[in-house]
């Protein structure tokens, strides 16, 4: 006889991360190609001296550093820290949604939203995208008296698009004040062209807005799992109540603080990624691909029924990309030589179609 598990888990998929294949070019996980700065490495080395001790469960120094980084309108009480922003997504579901409640988000979007909602016994309301972008009008129309939480993934993963600052502000104004709006900004550092929203201003103006950010992408600490939320102190207190103790390591906290100290240098690296993004996008379009304008560190190829063939042939060429069913393929913008190899493959594949 096996243990009796919750029956609703039977229908949940197991998360499948981007593959790592020895010797292959990995363009599947939106990782930065830049390693930690020397100052961050030094902080990591120092932190190893105390790994026999539990980490600071309250992340006191990191929260203080984040508050300083965010500006004078924010205090540590406005900040929650988690084991990556994905953990904070789950915590937000936990503190807002009960059995039968609804959580609204565009689809396709971050693939862990649906299972996180279902594990809570709540109902995911997946609103189709328009032109690969969140349709905020349709999302607003999907709000009911059972809606407890709305996710706006901006830039959207995996389609790379953003909703404009004005449209996002109007949406926030229109959502009832008792519904929490989570603006998931894992890739916000890559937004250009005047499309970056004043999300922190929305937090200041609306008690029901929380912003999620991460050190995994632009800051290059994906392996240390550090994310944070910015919101009203009542929301932050609720997140802290469901935080699993000690899940943010002492090494991660030290690395994050050192990264904030070097933020200007680290964020300057995003200009290199953005330049490569423009080059890769232009060359893909010149080769005959259709793709939306990216504001992230990846591009989206809506290949439909040809998705699996593209992925398999890329693997044969020792290039690993990320498929999303029969919707399309997400491709990380990587180092120039890696991007060149991908572009050579993409042109060959396109010429055979």
UniProtKB/Swiss-Prot annotation:
Enzyme class, spelled out: transferase
One Gene Ontology MF term: pyridoxal phosphate binding
Cofactor: pyridoxal 5'-phosphate
InterPro entries reported for this sequence: Aminotrans_II_pyridoxalP_BS (IPR001917), Aminotransferase_I/II_large (IPR004839), ArAT (IPR024892), HisP_aminotrans (IPR005861), HistidinolP_aminotransfase (IPR050106), PyrdxlP-dep_Trfase (IPR015424), PyrdxlP-dep_Trfase_major (IPR015421), PyrdxlP-dep_Trfase_small (IPR015422)
Modified residues (N6-(pyridoxal phosphate)lysine): 217
EC annotation from Swiss-Prot or TrEMBL: 2.6.1.57
Keyword Transferase: yes
Reaction(s) catalysed (UniProt annotation): an aromatic L-alpha-amino acid + 2-oxoglutarate = an aromatic oxo-acid + L-glutamate
Residue ranges of the TM segments: none
Gene3D superfamilies: Aspartate Aminotransferase, domain 1, Type I PLP-dependent aspartate aminotransferase-like (Major domain)
Family the UniProt entry places it in: Belongs to the class-II pyridoxal-phosphate-dependent aminotransferase family.
PANTHER family: HISTIDINOL-PHOSPHATE AMINOTRANSFERASE, HISTIDINOL-PHOSPHATE AMINOTRANSFERASE 2
Function: Aminotransferase that catalyzes the conversion of aromatic amino acids and 2-oxoglutarate into corresponding aromatic oxo acids and L-glutamate.
Protein name: Aromatic amino acid aminotransferase
Natural source organism: Mycobacterium bovis (strain ATCC BAA-935 / AF2122/97)
Lineage of producing organism: Bacteria, Bacillati, Actinomycetota, Actinomycetes, Mycobacteriales
Gene from which the chain derives: pat
């Amino acid at each position: 006889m096996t243990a009796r598990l919750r029956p609703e888990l039977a229908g949940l998929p197991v998360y499948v991360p981007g593959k790592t294949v020895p010797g292959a070019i990995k363009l599947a996980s939106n990782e930065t190609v830049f390693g930690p700065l020397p100052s961050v490495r030094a902080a990591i080395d120092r932190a190893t001296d105390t790994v026999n001790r539990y980490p600071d469960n309250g992340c006191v120094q990191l929260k203080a550093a984040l508050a300083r980084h965010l500006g004078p309108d924010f205090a540590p009480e406005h900040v929650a820290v988690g084991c990556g922003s994905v953990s904070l997504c789950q915590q937000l579901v936990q503190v807002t949604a009960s059995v039968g409640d609804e959580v609204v988000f565009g689809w396709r979007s971050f693939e862990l939203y649906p299972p996180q909602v279902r594990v809570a016994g709540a109902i995911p309301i997946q609103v189709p995208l328009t032109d690969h972008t969140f349709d905020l009008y349709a999302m607003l129309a999907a709000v009911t008296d059972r809606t407890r939480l709305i996710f706006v993934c901006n830039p959207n993963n995996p389609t790379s698009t953003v909703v404009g600052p004005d449209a996002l502000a109007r949406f926030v104004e229109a959502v009832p004040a008792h519904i929490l709006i989570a603006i998931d900004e894992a890739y916000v550092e890559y937004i250009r062209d005047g499309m970056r929203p004043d999300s922190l201003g929305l937090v200041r103006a609306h008690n029901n807005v929380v912003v999620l950010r991460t050190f995994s992408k632009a800051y290059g600490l994906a392996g240390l799992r550090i994310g944070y939320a910015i919101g009203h102190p009542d929301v932050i207190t609720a997140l802290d109540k469901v935080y699993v103790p000690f899940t943010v390591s002492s090494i991660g906290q030290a690395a994050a603080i050192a990264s904030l100290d070097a933020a200007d240098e680290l964020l300057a690296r995003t200009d290199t990624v953005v330049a490569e993004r423009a080059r890769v996008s232009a060359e893909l379009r010149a080769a005959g691909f259709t793709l939306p304008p990216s504001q992230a560190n990846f591009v989206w190829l809506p290949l439909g029924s040809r998705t699996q063939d593209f992925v398999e042939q890329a693997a044969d060429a020792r290039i690993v990309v990320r498929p999303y069913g029969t919707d399309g393929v997400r491709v990380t913008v990587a180092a120039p030589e890696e991007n060149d190899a991908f572009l050579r493959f993409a042109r060959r594949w396109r010429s055979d179609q």
